[in-house]
Amino acid sequence: MLRTTRWVAAIIFLYSFPGYAEETFDTHFMIGGMKGEKVSEYHFDNKQPLPGNYELDFYVNNQWRGKQDITIPESPVKPCLPKVLLTKLGVKTGNLNTEDNCILLDKAVHGGQYQWDISEHRLNLTVPQAYINELERGYVPPESWDRGIDAFYTSYNLSQYRSYDSNNNSNTASYGRFNSGLNLFSWQLHSDASYSKPDDMKGTWQSNTLYLEHGWSQILSTVQIGENYTSSLIFDSLRFSGIRLFRDMQMLPDSMQSFTPLVQGVAQSNALITVSQNGYIIYQKEVPPGPFTIADLQLSGSGSDLDVSIKEADDSVRSFLVPYSSVPNMLQPGISNFDFIAGRSKIYGVKNQEDFLEANYIYGLNNLLTLYGGTILSDNYNAITLGNGWNTPLGAISFDATRSSSKLNNDITHEGTSYQVAYNKYLVQTATRFSVAAWRYASQDYRTFSDHLYENDKINHQSDYDDFYDIGRKNSLSANIMQPLSNNLGNVSLSALWRNYWGRSGNAKDYQFSYSNSWQRISYTFSASQSYDENDKEEERFNLFISIPFYWGDDIAKTRHQINLSNSTSFSKDGYSSNNTGITGIAGEHDQLNYGIYVNQQQQNNDTSLGTNLSWRTPIATIDGSYSHSKNAWQSGGSISSGLVVWPGGINITNQLSDTFAILDAPGLEGAHINGQKYNRTNSKGQVVYDLMIPHRENHLVLDTANSESETELQGNRQIIAPYRGAVSYVQFTTDQRKPWYIQALRPDGSPLTFGYDVLDLQENNIGVVGQGSRLFIRVDEIPTGIKVALNDEQNLFCTITFQHVIDENKTYICQ
């Protein structure tokens, strides 16, 4: 595979100056380059590159469409792209009249342009919009998703907490959490397990989830087999063991994952369509005469209506309004979401589990209406839900009803109905957002599936779940209002929750208010809450929080440092309650140390406590520690978290892991940072694990060698990859590990050697280039016995420099 380097690009840049224009520059200057080819023939100016096989990033109209292999033939044959590849790239081929399956680039771009950028391993295609199957920006077609490699990984967090009181009573608690995975043959085995050991008690292991997973791009879905949790798409989530097939909404473009209206109209001529929201242009596109549909809008969360204008070729403008509000479960027209489950419940603490089937389906019918429904079926329980969501000019509203039937083991049957209404609206004029949700349980006999299981268990085993599980819900109402104030006067939010129960006389109520703002660097928040329990017992609380950040250093000449000073004061209806003052900051050359110090004072027991916490991030682990002390007690705690990856290329340890990550491999390059993470650097082998990967989306991976002292040369520091969810992607960077040498040399008459000519070893292998000022640059595994430099390339005249197993970079050599 042919590669070039940034160093080579600099040589070419120097060579482009007029003073060197008369030289014929040989491409042997490329370390490992191709013999006998001239730079004038290499065509860095967007002409056909040298023959060979290349792995390139393909960009269509500046949008990444994947990484593909391409073969450049010997001149004068022109390069072509297979029809299959063009289809993958989203370029239409139906109108290309050719019997050959390989289409010349000149024809493939439909009158557009193509541009080679071999130094970046990239081919840019500019194709008229009419011949492109458009992709939403940032979205990657399924054909380019990466399944990853086979690997085993585990991430863990181990912690211990210890406390003593004034009576010398102590308590120690230990805890461990392990998230592991095994990826084989495009399937992934996921495990989430924990270990806990309270003081003076036996430790216990608990498995939370254990399941196989596989993504199917053909149906944009994922299948899971094992112990997991159902979704809360329509019914409440519960733990189960079985099989689940669901639409993975992250496989869809962002605009299709939730409700966005279709913008439709008719253009009378070549027209410019402009879509605005809140006065800002969010979409603009030229369309030909005739009907048009815009389905790839990426809207803000404001929920405000869309202003659409059609500017015709004669400058006439027509405008119309498209209502836009959304509630949960609403989808774009034509988009569906589904979730199917078959299995057995596995709720903790319940001895009698049940087999069940669950099916959920949502479909966006049009800009106005979304329909949804679901059902749960078991031997002794069934429930069905039907609902709809409406997008109206007055706001978005949804309504659904659920009918349930629960037959208990004592032959008593409970049947009931619940109703749910939700409403959202954003007022553009005042920037007010408010939402209301209400639940009504028409009778005390309504049961969820979890209610049914717990109640059966209570009957069978005389268990008492009343303290933590309640089947007496009757009515519930919640409301939220968020209001930004004009002239940068801050933000206000209000919320209320009201609920009551069957068989109880009282109502529970919660009210909350908050105001937040900032002045220069200082931010502050005032909050107030009031709550009443079912016995009308009142509790009031007020809080004032202030945060002041301090910065110094520009992260260029000096390391940037940051400290935050904060204070939180609380009051109750009886007056002052507590105060907490703290300092937090980040330190270290690589921002690896986080620290905090605080003082807390409690009015109720007239107690003051002092505390501190530290977090140290290393390339292989994150270590946390905390300590606090008061007159009545002291506590200390510590934890360590890390990750381990075993793969065909070795074993890597990292400070954190998610279930979708990448192993970057730049052989021999030590100390390079990945994507600005100063604490995450390549190891001695040039490998580093990066875990902030977004499934099914472009992930740009950039290695920064600015602080690396490695002599290994990185040839191209950027890669792009789009992994499946749960994939372990392997991303290889090209490096040159040969040792670099700089040699000052002159001709026998003392004149400089010709800039840009090759440097060969005595076996005539290309090992370097003549740089500016007659300075030679070579890369070799071992010091050669001698080197050859061309004096006159056309006449095949060379001079030679010999070495006695040593190269003195401070010496000026004479090329004989």
Q: Positions of the model-derived regions?
A:
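N-terminal signal peptide c-region/cleavage motif recognized by signal peptidases
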Residues: 16-18
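Sec-dependent signal peptide recognition
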Residues: 3-10
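Extracytoplasmic assembly/pore-lining segments of large envelope/extracellular complexes
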Residues: 294-305
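Core alpha-helical transmembrane segments of integral membrane proteins
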Residues: 180, 340-349, 357-375, 385, ...
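Flexible, glycine-rich linker and terminal segments associated
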Residues: 23-54, 65, 84-89, 96, ...
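Short acidic/polar beta-strand-loop edge motifs in secreted extracellular
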Residues: 65-78
